[in-house]
């Protein structure tokens, strides 16, 4: 079944910034997709096209990207009469139309909007759920419910506090299914709120962009201490591990790292990559920290390689790899990390996202599917993580509807699968896939 109409519009994301939404029509109906956007972005990401007109949305408008869909992509795509199940053909056609290495002509936000909508239409065309269609595209017989990674304490570029490290997460890997993982996550979140309120006062429980708390603390181990207390109070010390997203590129200065980067600059306090690595090792020793994302700058390859060789935890590449097969290949060769953070808008199409995922998995890496800090109510990544069988997803705290939209969709998927539902749990790094 081919596409009859495509219409893009500008909508607002969860931070009040414009983003692209695409409606795609076939004889089966209308299929809608919205594109997310990040705050801490890697320099190697595909280009998100913004208007740059300061008189409108402070320069963040997406009218140009919307126009590219409506005026450049739509007619040419419809003319080709591709079947919507041919995801790869359609994505490659758009990439050829754009013709640039990083999608800078149309913008990754234009191409991805269409790509996501095509994927939803393809599932409807086959009469299967979206997660099943994605599993087929990836060549998987199985589908797997992921372990959620709830970002419950925010720092870095996501928060107005002095905390340098961007995310402190809880992963309920000891849960027996996804529903239980949600309950554990929510209960720890509520306990954490009470712990923070008791220690720092009521205004310390205001939430950040991703629904986590952003108490005004400076020391990163203080955040870990708060998590440890909340996990114990909730009664789940044996079921939860801690994950971190350091986003170290945000505080990399002159070859060193500034753990107080939100204060006036003082090079005397900068630390080396080795010192930062030792700090992480102390976290791993003192707390159940089992996953660290972006521990070093996106181009500090030596520090990555040294650290990954020295620890047995999950080391996740985000700014390092930006879901880009070329960067992933480089990281594989250098043994820089052992897990890919998969963000569809970093690479800009469904086909390339699947390719990046398969490349990582074929090299023995784990894969964690991720939201962005500027999200929408679109739930595509919930189906994506189930279909790609990656075993882990991070899409914020159990708070704020644009985050819960994904978690709730995962609960619906688990319910729909019934007795066939498999939960990654303790195998979150390497789920058993058929």
UniProtKB/Swiss-Prot annotation:
Keyword terms, alphabetized: Allergen, Cytoplasm, Glycolysis, Lyase, Magnesium, Metal-binding
Known role: Glycolytic enzyme that catalyzes the conversion of 2-phosphoglycerate to phosphoenolpyruvate.
Keyword Cytoplasm attached: yes
An annotated Gene Ontology molecular function: magnesium ion binding
Subunit structure: Dimer.
Family: Belongs to the enolase family.
Pfam families: Enolase_C, Enolase_N
A Gene Ontology term for the protein's cellular component: phosphopyruvate hydratase complex
Binding residues annotated for Mg(2+), in chain numbering: 245, 293, 318
Protein known as: Beta-enolase
Signal peptide annotation: none
Lineage, highest ranks first: Eukaryota, Metazoa, Chordata, Craniata, Vertebrata
Catalytic activity: (2R)-2-phosphoglycerate = phosphoenolpyruvate + H2O
Gene3D superfamilies: Enolase-like C-terminal domain, Enolase-like, N-terminal domain
